Regions:
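Surface-exposed, low-hydrophobicity beta-strand/loop segments enriched in small/polar/acidic residues
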Residues: 1-128
């Protein structure tokens, strides 16, 4: 039976440090005026203009991997999601906090778009 083709971005697997059995995501900000691109769990992210943005294929200076977002919706509801809906704004222009796996010693599982040799296991992935 062939492997299932179900792309999921980068999924945290484990850390290389002895104390990092639990993956930890650190907090960053998205432009509170409403960044116009959706970001999904497992997407690579970069800094642009001081805020987190979704990385394009081949982007340099990757900050890390998007985990989830927290903000207070315009109706006053505290909101946690595993994706950032495009052009979201928070109540009163408040902060939109995104959580990013940014530890350089974090290992991830990622789906390839073709056959991979055994020698690829444990190596870096090219995002082009």
């Amino acid at each position: 039976m062939a492997n299932v083709d179900k792309a999921f971005g980068l999924r945290p697997y484990k850390g290389l440090n002895t104390g990092s059995a639990v993956q930890q995501a650190n907090s960053y900000s998205i432009d509170p005026s409403g960044y116009g691109t959706a970001i999904y769990q497992g997407d690579l992210v970069i800094f642009a203009g001081g805020y987190i943005n979704r990385a394009a294929a081949g982007s340099a200076n990757i900050v890390g991997v998007f985990s989830h977002v927290y903000y207070v919706a315009t109706d006053g509801t505290p909101t946690f999601k595993n994706y950032y809906p495009a052009s979201t704004t928070a109540l009163g222009g408040g902060a939109i906090d995104v959580f990013v796996y940014d530890d350089p010693n974090q290992l991830f599982v990622v789906q390839a778009d073709g056959a991979s040799a055994v020698t690829c296991i444990g190596r870096n992935a090219d995002t082009d």
